[in-house]
Amino acid sequence: MSGLFITLEGPEGAGKSTNREYLAARLREQGVDVVMTREPGGTPLAERIRELLLAPSEEAMAVDTELLLMFAARAQHLAQVIRPALARGAVVLCDRFTDATYAYQGGGRGLSVERIAILESFVQGELRPDLTLVFDLPVEVGLARAAARGRLDRFEQEGQAFFEAVRQAYLQRAGQQPQRYSLLDAAQPLAAVQRAIDALLPGILERCRG
């Protein structure tokens, strides 16, 4: 069995974490070695960087600082978790990866795709996800779900225009590479979203065992 790198992307309140758990359980039922992780974070050091990125602060974080911290956490995560898991043949399910950087720092913050791509190449080399599930939903629905969870982090405190730009960046990337992305309607009831995941399962298992 070869390693497979699957990322789950989408804006706030899209249900990525819940559906990551669901997909992991379905794969494990088939005897697949699954590693669940997230970004920013995934290792003790990367989780400390995550805290810096998400905690509201009186000092405004420069956009380049935010971008570099994202990739610093990613470099540690790749070295300690993702690359070793793929090398042993595991399926890695990651809640957010570099597509989130293109969506949030690119779409939301307005950084150029070229600027992000330089860091992507430097930190990741040739490594890219094999499959990316994009959980899409209207911004107002996602923000309402995020607010219902309680205290908002630094990103969740951004306004609707920011998240509209994030959403459009995700949709644009998915449209450019349909062979890598699967777009799921996350505004549906959870059971319907998970039926859509089930429909992808045979193809994922075939790639695992191919």
Swiss-Prot record:
Ligand binding (ATP): 10-17
UniProt EC number: 2.7.4.9
Record keyword ATP-binding present: yes
BP GO terms, sorted: dTDP biosynthetic process; dTTP biosynthetic process; dUDP biosynthetic process
Transcription regulation listed as a keyword: no
Gene Ontology cellular-component annotations: cytosol
Pfam assignment, any one: Thymidylate_kin
Superkingdom of source: Bacteria
GO molecular function, one term: ATP binding
SUPFAM superfamilies: P-loop containing nucleoside triphosphate hydrolases (SSF52540)
Protein family membership: Belongs to the thymidylate kinase family.
Protein name in the entry: Thymidylate kinase
Organism: Pseudomonas entomophila (strain L48)
Lineage: Bacteria, Pseudomonadati, Pseudomonadota, Gammaproteobacteria, Pseudomonadales
